[in-house]
Amino acid sequence: ELNYDEINLNVGCPSKAVQKGSFGACLMKDKTLVKNCLDAMQINRDIEVSIKCRIGLGKNFNYEFFEEFIDEILKSGIRLVYIHARNAILNGISPKGNRNIPPLNYNFVSKIKSKYPYVTFILNGGINSMDKALKLSKLHDGVMLGRLIQNNPFCLKDVDRQFYNQTNNYIISEKTIIDYFNFIRPKFGTDSIYRLLSPLLNIFFGVPNAKEFKIDIHSMMKENNFEILEKIFLNFIKEKKIFIN
């Protein structure tokens, strides 16, 4: 009804809150249940169903476990799999720790691809620069970026040239800021101002002399002054355009 292009089942999150609900990475313990979920999700054959998973559970690598998991879920007929190429450790490590403490193993993704060449496997995990993303994209079906974009939204400004040999004239305009504030305005007062504005905070990444703007923003966030915050962001964009073209 909402006309989505794709529905993704995420069985890669290791948080305790998620585990209490019996979903997330702990579902990898029951590959048949995951397969049944994917079956049920494909009621509308016009919408692609995919899955995002880890390569295993616990501290030790186990390719047999990973392979058997993929074997089972592919029986559902899905052909798009996003893989965070780390194990998920369900106890003793925070979700943040689970994003960097378990070692990466890209070889598992390459190996399963050789078994299922007709399935699209998208690599995720540890891709902390666009240069690394470009290199890995040539070795795999594709790459998925997460924290890199959150930490530095402007990392994508040159993606068309790097990946597709196309020129672009990328710029964040005042309209972008206005549209975003219009989007979050109805939620102001009922949701955390830090949560609402966090997607914008990293537009300062790597921009010279941005410290004064950050100080003003954090001050106004403490005062919950929504309108002044919008003006600060707009002034920043107007003054710093030269640095984010």
Residue ranges with predicted function:
Residues 1-49, 55-62, 209:
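Active-site beta->alpha loop and helix N-cap motifs at the rims of alpha/beta catalytic domains
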Residues 6-15, 75-88, 145-149:
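Non-cysteine beta-strand/loop elements that form the S-adenosyl-L-methionine
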Residues 3, 19-20, 96, 119, ...:
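Short, functionally important structural connectors and interaction interfaces within domains
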Residues 51-62, 86-98:
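Active-site-proximal beta-alpha loop/turn segments in soluble metabolic enzymes
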Residues 36-39, 44-46, 57-71, 75-80, ...:
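Alpha/beta catalytic cores of nucleotide-metabolism and tRNA/nucleoside-modifying enzymes
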Residues 16-17, 90-91, 131, 152:
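Generic structural signal for helix capping and beta-alpha/helix-loop junctions
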Residues 16-33, 63-64, 92-105, 165-167:
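Glycine-rich tight-turn/loop motif centered on a GG-T
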Residues 7-10, 26-31, 82-84, 101-102, ...:
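Catalytic beta/alpha-barrel core
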